[in-house]
């Protein structure tokens, strides 16, 4: 679905910060590469991610999975690369975050992959990781929560930094 920003980024940040004050880590889940996504949507999404205070980010490219309406529609439109399941599960499992196994409507595959790599790497830059962990510690006085952010972030960072695109 489209990112619903009708209430503004500030209202989302208030919700996130409210939860964080209650010692809840916020994991932002973003899927890009839908048919409504184009370069402008990616730019707006990046601006949103630069201002929202997620502790952890899961940013990945849409994956049409067998048995879903999306998979059936893309198959009918002849936009799928992987059609031989379960054999193709191996390819999908190895590239779940960064793989583009269909033809996006308004973006080329490399643009989409490079964007995810760049934005994920930026979100998980060492400086930003430490900054988020420090903010968490100041808000919660919980070394465990701050350490959780550091460990999860450096693990996630590898996904984006090591992506071959």
What are these regions (language model features)?
Residues 140-148:
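Hydrophobic alpha-helical membrane-insertion signals
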Residues 1-141:
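A structural motif corresponding to the C-terminal lobe/cap of the Radical SAM core domain
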